[in-house]
């Protein structure tokens, strides 16, 4: 059995990056979490075949080192959407529309498109998705015996975080890093508590609704010193500092791509509407020609003859006044 370096403190994992990997993991995309340093591998099938052969050999020879991130099944996707609808949607008409979408062929994408058209529901969805994903990831990490802390949950300075990564396998370190390691060890225990999987609802009167202000998380640089040569080209290193950047979509990798597609769809719909209006205008013009009008101008369509009649009538009245 292969022996590996032993980390001197809990692994520093990025929950947002894990959420992204969990949402993208499917039948065509494999993600692995490393047990030694905590980096993520994405087996991109678009890489050269030689590189793919090397990474598959690495995964096979060191199977105990890499943990395959679970696939998001069709049932799980539907369950996530269904739970959100039943627990978070209160308007009857909106709920009925969501349930109708749930039964459609492309439910996942239609669900998101409808969500993004309703800002109030979008905020609830993003919060719900982050909370449920976090619980799912913690449960998976616990089941696979990872000793970890989420970097986004820490108040350490960037320098301390990077020093912890640089000296991850060093037994002897300075006082500052020793103290930081102790804090990490205490923090790691929280993820194995009952509350980590069953967060307690806050008691008391709910706070007044205020404008949502989303703050980006300050994170440290990626520092890995034990990445095998064959795995380096497959490191999964997206810079995600905000939960809203993670999309539930199976077609688009980022929220920006998804929103760009939505805007593109809107433009297509507008173009179709303009085309329909043009066709109706042409039909109306053809009909007017059959009725004896040369154009659809206001004067022609409503008749110039009426104006002539009015003019003659006014003239005849003046004539009668002169004869008297």
Curated annotation (Swiss-Prot):
Pfam families in the cross-refs: UPF0158
Source organism, top-level taxon: Bacteria
Family: Belongs to the UPF0158 family.
Name of the protein this chain belongs to: UPF0158 protein CPn_0518/CP_0235/CPj0518/CpB0539
Organism: Chlamydia pneumoniae (Chlamydophila pneumoniae)
